[in-house]
């Protein structure tokens, strides 16, 4: 049995990075991520309701919204599956954070604060499957000179990070190694090197969870595992459908179309069935409707009708 929480779950991710009482963890991670660029000394968590809400994202995307002492904003996300318009969605989120800084009247001089989007991706991004870290800025197409530093995207493809413990050379790499392998540890590495990992070990120890938090975590891990099972089933169904179509239209063309269609159908049908099943079980156990909606991604109307 795992000793430490799974950071790819909603409860796990937010326990590590989303608690004001333990905000030093997120501060340390951001400083290691942006080492050599800036030094953050404090953050304030913002109301996540300020972010655009898409009910279908719940259950597979978990986000945290905060600002630092200089007023710069950070959106930190964990995403467990790729979406068709993943890049557009990221651009929309950050653009909304920029737009909300506007003030009415002639006195405002467009003195914008930078907005950073940090996206943990627990999957291979289809258009750049082999690159772990991708940094996106607004720059001149010909000279590569930065046009503006007010919008920054950092994509982290976790499956592409393959370093072992003794191969990690920076504190940022140590963070990623710990997050990616957390469930397999009986003790966290790097504690002697950096005190934040000592603090992290205390926070992520499952034995330290209260009874209520443990119940929420157990449901969160169930939703996460069901999601993985749905994806595996969808991929298999897509492969079989693709091969059947390939017999008629050619193996290569048929597999491509069949897999895409099968995966989409499998995701939609399988995920909804799992969400309803999880919500029904949580409702029976007396969970608050808002907690059920947050974990499963269902609307309150759908939950009340169960």
Label each region the model flagged.
Residues 1-306:
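Elongated, amphipathic alpha-helical interaction scaffolds
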């Amino acid at each position: 049995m795992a000793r430490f929480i799974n950071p790819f779950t909603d409860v796990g991710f937010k326990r590590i990075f989303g608690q004001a009482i333990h905000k030093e963890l997120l501060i340390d991670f951001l400083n290691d991520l942006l080492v050599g660029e800036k030094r953050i000394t404090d953050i304030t968590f913002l109301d996540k309701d300020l972010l655009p809400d898409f009910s279908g994202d719940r259950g597979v995307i978990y986000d945290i919204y905060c600002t630092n002492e200089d007023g710069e904003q950070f959106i930190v996300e964990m995403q467990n599956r790729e979406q068709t318009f993943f890049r557009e969605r990221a651009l929309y989120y950050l653009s909304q954070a920029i737009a909300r800084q506007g003030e009415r009247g002639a006195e405002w001089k467009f003195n914008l604060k930078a907005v950073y989007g940090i996206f943990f991706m627990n999957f291979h991004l289809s258009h750049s499957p082999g690159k772990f870290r991708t940094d996106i800025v607004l720059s001149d197409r010909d000279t590569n000179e930065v046009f503006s530093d007010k919008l920054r995207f950092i994509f982290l493809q976790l499956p592409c990070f393959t370093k072992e413990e003794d191969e990690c050379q920076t504190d940022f790499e140590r963070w990623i190694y710990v997050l990616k392998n957390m469930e397999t540890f009986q003790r966290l590495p790097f504690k002697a090197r950096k005190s934040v990992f000592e603090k992290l070990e205390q926070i992520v120890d499952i034995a330290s969870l209260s009874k209520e938090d443990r119940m929420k975590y157990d449901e969160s891990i169930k939703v996460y595992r069901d999601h993985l099972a749905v994806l595996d089933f969808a991929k298999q169904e897509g492969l079989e459908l693709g091969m059947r179509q390939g017999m008629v239209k050619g193996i290569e063309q048929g597999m491509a179309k069949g897999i895409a269609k099968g995966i989409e159908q499998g995701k939609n049908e399988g995920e909804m069935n799992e969400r309803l099943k999880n919500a029904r079980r949580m409702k029976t156990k007396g969970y608050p409707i808002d907690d059920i909606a947050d974990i499963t991604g269902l609307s309150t109307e759908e939950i009340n009708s169960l």
